[in-house]
Amino acid sequence: MKLVQVQHPLVKHKLGLMRSAEINTKKFRELATEVGSLLTYEATADLETEKVIIDGWCGPVEIDQIKGKKVTVVPILRAGLGMMDGVLEHVPSARISVVGMYRDEETLEPVPYFQKLASDLEERLAIVVDPMLATGGSMIATIDLLKAKGCKHIKVLVLVAAPEGIKALEAAHPDIELYTASVDSHLNEQGYIIPGLGDAGDKIFGTK
């Protein structure tokens, strides 16, 4: 599995702000979008381009365009919605595929409850977004679902990842790519990432 920890100073700065215990919902939500955007920039660096001729202001001009790659953004409900707009800033024509997964607080296992996927998944690059990669259970289950529907090219974007989740994801899906702003220390007994961000879903949606 390709693992990329994005080292850009802006990513480090913005993620650091998100770790504050004093951060409010508005600021956390804005930063989740911004870091999601920066991760997307890194994750799409290998998209193929092709030369095309267009009519410029002074006549025909040769430009580079993305070579017809179909993309679907896959936010894992609910917290993944907080990163979705950051991806769409760069690929605004992407289709949106929604997967509902929540983690049972006792077993820590993923429980699926909703899916609405784009058509032609076998032809699309799926960019799966979720702020936290903790145990990896929800992410693995989501990728299982995408592959079962024919998707072959998958990239995962998370704000923070625990070593335990990375190891589990690599064991289950060694062919995907993982982009993260930080590889954190470990999971605590409750399955939360340390130091992490707290409950990203609650912070994005202003709930407890």
Curated annotation (Swiss-Prot):
Cofactors, names only: Mg(2+)
Binding sites annotated in the UniProt record for uracil: 193, 198-200
Gene Ontology biological-process entries: UMP salvage; uracil salvage
Activity control note: Allosterically activated by GTP.
Pathway of action: Pyrimidine metabolism; UMP biosynthesis via salvage pathway; UMP from uracil: step 1/1
Protein name according to UniProt: Uracil phosphoribosyltransferase
Annotated family: Belongs to the UPRTase family.
Keyword terms, alphabetized: Allosteric enzyme, Glycosyltransferase, GTP-binding, Magnesium, Nucleotide-binding, Transferase
Catalytic activity: UMP + diphosphate = 5-phospho-alpha-D-ribose 1-diphosphate + uracil
Taxonomic superkingdom: Bacteria
Organism: Pasteurella multocida (strain Pm70)
EC number in record: 2.4.2.9
Record's function text: Catalyzes the conversion of uracil and 5-phospho-alpha-D-ribose 1-diphosphate (PRPP) to UMP and diphosphate.
Enzyme category, top tier: transferase
Sample GO molecular function, one term: GTP binding
Binding residues for 5-phospho-alpha-D-ribose 1-diphosphate: 78, 103, 130-138, 199
Cofactor binding note: Binds 1 Mg(2+) ion per subunit. The magnesium is bound as Mg-PRPP.
